[in-house]
A protein has these predicted regions:
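Small/polar glycine-rich anion-binding or flexible loop at a beta-alpha turn
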Residues: 114, 234-237, 276-288
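Activity-critical C-terminal alpha-helical subdomain
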Residues: 34, 287-322
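Conserved, mostly hydrophobic/aromatic
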Residues: 60, 241, 310
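FAD-binding subdomain of flavoenzyme oxidoreductases
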Residues: 1-109
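Alpha-helix capping/hinge segments and adjacent helical runs
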Residues: 270-282, 311-315
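Short, hydrophobic/aliphatic alpha-helical segments
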Residues: 35-56, 220-221, 259-273, 303
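A short, flexible low-complexity segment enriched in Lys/Arg and Gly/Pro that occurs
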Residues: 24-44, 209-213, 248-260, 287-293
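C-terminal substrate-recognition/cap domain of FAD-linked oxidoreductases
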Residues: 70, 74, 80-264, 268, ...
Length: 322
């Protein structure tokens, strides 16, 4: 129910898409008490509005999911991981394009040197290679056959020749792949001690470099003592912005300043026609900022849909909008 309520995504969206891509049918109880059996597991069903998609991503505001029919997928074989050190953020986009043009990727993540420095300081993660880099790309792909590994190495060498990559490593075992994934998966826990101001945002993949440059400029101009840590699912345009609290600021002072940063960030999201919430939902925290992504006309339609399924407002009240 939680995955459906938020239309959950994650690190494999570039390959598998969002939760809604896998839901063949739903049984729900609406706020009116009606039991609806939506789509009933069918692949083809061209009989009007597909109501199941209203409940996916609705954050539980329309009804309660009681049963799900989910499409299954085979387990991937011989997942292989590459971590690449990258000199400029624009090079990450070029690397993504180079690999996607010739291979199917199961993940393509990025993180910056701030994240890596914090990770290495814990002693729980090993440096992937000796060369330092301002940005890092982590990509994953299935390699059940030797020619796929050869293709990946050829693309890597081409990227090196173009100057897009400073250094890199490719996993040779399941254990090494798991160790390389720690560079990405341990970031959130590691930076939590710095009381980060977090944002989960998205823009079109092609606009990511400009967007990040704009946000970095805004933060450095207005709050030069704030340290920014970036990571995210670059393969689908989902960025995790983290601003780390300076030691000389109290939590209250820091988060008061971050409320101003919020406005700058969401104005920039709006400028790029992006989303204030890529995968974590709106809930109560981002409710005041919904207009930065959704115009008034759309929000009016959302309220009208809510009224149809939950006229008494009993389902997860106070979330998304008032």
């Amino acid at each position: 129910g939680g995955n459906i309520g938020t239309n959950a995504g994650g690190i494999k969206v570039i390959k598998y898409g969002m939760t809604r891509n896998w839901i063949l049918g739903l049984t729900v109880v609406t706020g009116k008490g009606d039991i609806l059996h939506l789509n009933k597991g069918m692949i083809k069903n061209a009989t009007g509005y597909d109501l199941r998609h209203l409940f996916i991503g609705a954050e539980g505001t329309l009804g309660i999911v009681t049963e799900v029919q989910v499409k299954l997928e085979r387990q991937p074989k011989n997942l292989t991981v590459m971590v690449l050190g990258v000199p400029k953020f624009t090079n990450i986009m070029q690397i993504l394009s180079a690999f996607q043009s010739k291979m199917d990727l199961t993940a393509f993540e990025f993180f910056d040197d701030v994240a890596v420095d914090k990770l290495l300081a814990t002693g729980h993660v090993q440096k992937p290679f000796e060369t330092d880099a301002p940005f890092y790309a982590l990509l994953e792909f299935e390699a059940p056959y030797e020619p796929i590994m050869d293709m990946a190495m050829q693309i890597f060498e081409d990227c090196m020749s173009e100057g897009w990559v400073l250094d890199g490593v490719m996993s040779q075992s399941i254990h090494q792949a798991q160790e390389l994934w720690k560079l990405r998966e341990y970031i959130s826990e590691t930076i939590s001690v710095f009381t980060p101001y977090k944002n989960d945002i998205s823009v079109l993949i092609s606009r990511v470099p400009e967007f990040i440059a704009d946000i970095d400029a805004i933060v450095s101009q207005n709050y030069p003592d704030f340290q920014v840590c970036w990571f995210g699912h670059i393969g689908d345009g989902n960025l995790h912005l983290n601003i780390l609290k300076p030691e000389n600021l109290s939590k209250d002072e820091f988060f008061e300043k971050c409320q101003v940063v919020n406005k700058y960030v969401f104005e920039t999201v709006q400028k790029y026609n992006g989303s204030i919430s890529a995968e974590h939902g709106v809930g109560m925290t981002k409710k005041p900022y919904l207009n930065y992504t959704r115009p008034d006309e759309e929000i009016d339609y959302l309220r009208a849909i809510k009224q149809v399924f939950d006229p008494n407002g009993i389902m997860n009240r106070g979330k998304i909008f008032d």
